[in-house]
């Protein structure tokens, strides 16, 4: 039974609502079945009860039992052990535990003891856990898309901190919503998200108004001036009720570990949280320790008078209603203006907090601009003195209320608005003076840097409340330069704000282009100071606030600006070499990506400024910048505009990109003299005109419109074909497919001598040219397709080689560049008579191949005799009912030679009608290849064991056979006279020799025309002459009633 009771205690040990008395009651029946005394099981229970809080739950608060149990020694031991646990687990600055509920005390049997389990650092843990989940993007389920970036977050946290997000998520129940905040900049959304997750952020004063306006638009609790209700809505409320919520969703017990943005201290001061996102890390740690000390002291005073409920011990400050109403469209993200009171209270404390942290420094600069400026020491001293005076005014009443209780705090809350009104006018005056002083100092620095005596700066600040023009107004705190040392402020906030300011720069700086094209860099990027005369003489273009008033705010990115930046980069390299550093790194810092925009800016060099005075001011300003470095000014020595090519121009007829190229070459030579040849080569390789970064297109017509600039960071005006040599992708190259026995040098291809029209210099761009026919590669049939892309010469040579059996069709197709299907149609005779190929075909087929002539087989000469002619006529009259066709047996001297004689028709009997094509069994082309060919007909020409005209097997020719016999090979039938061939064919037919099915329809048009052309009288021939004729040029084979296929 003791084991059972022990297991039950272990099972329910982590319960927070069940009392220990219940466990004792469950274990109480142990004493009845055991024959032991009463104190033994009770002592066991006492050990279990006393051990449980100390061993397993060390950080616990335990309240002593109100009523002792029935045995008298039990309450003493229990209370002692419980009090020991309380002393061990309770820190000094913690709050007392929550009292037991009334429902638990209403047990009818006996009063029960309740143990309150408390997680001391629960709120800190929750905040850190949510922040860690946000940083690692774990379990994120919503994406906030702003003007230039996107931020992922958790719907639960956003809904808990903003009724606006709560209403949006309730009305659009999707798994991962994407909320587009197009009117908000990236740093604003990131700061609001960090404020909701961490409870505090640090904001520069010039950005404070924008942040509060965005917080009011998004109804962020802690940023919006609204009253928080005492009761939270139930989860059973309908989604329509969420629209009525202007206030807090949870009245949680946020205590000393989660301060709001602006909270009252005991002295009535407004305590701004320390710098965590925007400020210095060292000052943030010191301010955080000071704030925690103050909160611990206030908590000690509040601990005695605090109520025992679950509400927050911190008094809530008075707030006003938000701007947004429940009837507004939830996706209307227009910014609302804030009240002057809330803005002044926050700015007032911001001045005081900065004066406490930085006694010897001026306020921080705006990190998002990336612009560094130096200021003289006297204005900084005046700012510090003014901040000290404000601190002394604030600290007059700070020592009085150290021992005030909660009632005094309530009185201070009532007088908070009165204090704000008292200091409102004074602080407003200070802020305006600060802005005036800042603008005056910045304009003086610009005038000193530009050496523009005629352009006197006018310190007339332009105040604006809009969030978009922070780059030009309200820069009261942006004075002292220095690289930022914060670890987490450069990642999203500054990166996003730099993207907005790009359109107001006079040029594309390196930092902006890097952050446009790369991932955000968490480390601070060092940018050298500008226009101050220091920093080793490095001069860059000033930020928008430092420009002379005559210059436009957003001029186009001209080539002149890039050229000036190149000169400035050269000066940076000289200064770096003088200080002992490697000069190329500074050159790369200044010019790495600026030349990438050269291609886009080259097209803009012909564009005139709208106001001629703007161009003159721009050139004067740039010439003043380049004057100390000994560089030539932009507009030439005569002061002419660089876009004009006339007598007033210093470089007539020279475009801006040409001057840039010359300047690059000159800089490369000068740097080679200054730092050695290796550095000059390195500079020329990286930034020279031949590098891909500065490559200009090979076409820029002076009379035509310029090529539009490419939005890419590399030049988009050069085609890939213009960069490729023509021999790399020549479509007319045979690609190494020559047969082994053919010399490629003997083949004439006129297209190989043509130059590639795509590589012609000085022509229009490739995409503006008219579409030219490609030299090769048109896969088209002779009829019914697009125009053929080969010449008649190529086709004639290809057909001549194929018909003479020097090549196969596939070899000729690859060598001569004619598609295989088209060439095959020509080889088979399916072409029109307009190509004049009939004579070539007759010559090639009737004459022997060149190899046969080299073997000693000459072409015979002579015509048909009258006897032969009369004999052939008689045979023709006998077989006029049979299915036959006439052919020609004229001979030729060589390929392409004219036939000198014709042969009469070949007689066949009627029973030889289906056997008229036996001589084509092995693929020997004795007739015109006009009919369909089998797929294996060309290999049969070379692979037949006894092929007669096989050039690779000369042993297959037997010229001594004079007669035919039944066992004669089919190809040898061609050597017999027509009369003897008839008997041999009949004999083979009776022996069962079959024909090739592919050769049954080989008749063509040329058979009848040859009979008509060569039917004239001739010289009588003997049997030997007829054999030579048949051996030299086999006559056309009669077809089985087939007709020519056109």
Swiss-Prot record:
UniProt cross-references to SMART domains, sorted A to Z: BTB
Start-end of Basic residues biased regions: 315-324, 768-777
Biased composition (Polar residues): 365-380
Subcellular location: Nucleus
Bias kind Pro residues: ranges: 65-75, 703-714
Transmembrane domains' residue ranges: none
InterPro entries, sorted: BTB/POZ_dom (IPR000210), Dros_DevTransReg (IPR051095), Homeodomain-like_sf (IPR009057), HTH_Psq (IPR007889), SKP1/BTB/POZ_sf (IPR011333)
CDD domains, alphabetized: BTB_POZ_BAB-like
Region (Disordered): 54-109, 290-342, 355-501, 632-655, 686-719, 758-791, 851-947, 998-1046
Amino acid composition bias (Gly residues), ranges on this chain: 636-651
Stretches with biased composition (Basic and acidic residues): 294-303, 383-412, 433-443, 866-881
Gene3D superfamilies associated with the record: Homeodomain-like, Potassium Channel Kv1.1, Chain A
Main location: nucleus
UniProt biased composition (Low complexity): 445-454, 882-897, 912-925
Comp. bias regions, Acidic residues: 413-432
SUPFAM superfamilies: Homeodomain-like, POZ domain
Biological processes, Gene Ontology terms: gravitaxis; larval feeding behavior; larval walking behavior; male courtship behavior; negative gravitaxis; oogenesis; regulation of transcription by RNA polymerase II; ventral midline development
Key words, A-Z: DNA-binding, Nucleus
Cellular component aspect of the GO annotation: nucleus
Function: Has a regulatory role during midline cell development.
Cross-referenced PANTHER family: BTB DOMAIN TRANSCRIPTION FACTOR, PROTEIN JIM LOVELL
The protein's name: Protein jim lovell
Species for this entry: Drosophila melanogaster (Fruit fly)
Gene that this sequence comes from: lov
